[in-house]
Amino acid sequence: MENLGKVFREFRISKNYSLKEAAGEACSTSQLSRFELGESDLAASRFFEILDNIHVTIENFMDKTRNFQHHEHVSLMAQIIPLYYSNDIAGFQKLQEEQLEKAKSSTNPLYFELNWILLQGLICQRDASFTMKQDDLDKVADYLFQTDEWTMFELILFGNLYSFYDVDYVARLGREVMEREDFYKEIGRHRKLVLILALNCYQHCLEHLAFENASYFEAYIEKIIGKSIKLYERNVFHFLKGFALYQKGQKEEGCKQMQEAMHIFDVLGLPEQVAYYQEHYDKFVKD
């Protein structure tokens, strides 16, 4: 709810309305001020009334709210990516502390709690001495199940925590996302996230020898990549198809294809990707 208050304040100030004018008969100026600061909520009827007072439609308001949330997600991910590739556990833990502090002062702490769990998952991926709690994984699963309209946040959440879940669950949830293609293809950024999620689901299925589910994601990736130039994603797919060959018993050909993909990442000047896929190769390829 505090996001709604912040967005409302931006609209009010940009339109040069005072607190008193915006509050009108709907609430007191102190109530509106607390709402803008995220310290309290407003009843739906009062909320719609204050929107009318500053002449903003609910459609325009919600568009701006989604953009506001999008910028929060992007800001967090911009901090996460360098920490992940540098194995900076202390940096992750600092971000976790910040999310906990935000949760404590928030009227809707779930968003920050889920961010904390996301960060814990990334810590566990980089350092095996850390573990995920089942309660945290259940909280994420419950949230995703109850959310009908996925945004960037849900795609990022599932896309980074999928490896902690049973392969059948990942395949089922992944299929549900893929089958909503018409929704995502209108939103370029979301479509790229869906492609990355499909690659992740494909990898997870192959790691667990779930070839029937893997074939579904392979076909989906072939379709969504099409003839477009997505060099990074194409090369990840090239590696994973090599991994599929290896897992199905064509070991020599599979190893050759995975090594080709790692060489391409090296030529492209992407040492972090080389290291990641070399680590994956070493984990699964047995002499």
What are these regions (language model features)?
Residues E97-K104, D138-Q146, M178-K185, E218-K227, ...:
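Amphipathic alpha-helical segments of tetratricopeptide repeats
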Residues E154-L231:
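Alpha-helical adaptor scaffolds
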Residues S45-N60:
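DNA major-groove recognition helix of helix-turn-helix/homeodomain DNA-binding modules
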Residues M1-S14:
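A short, Lys/Arg-rich alpha-helix, primarily the initiator
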Residues Y85-E98, S129-D138, V167-E179, H208-A219, ...:
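Helix-turn-helix repeat elements of alpha-solenoid scaffolds
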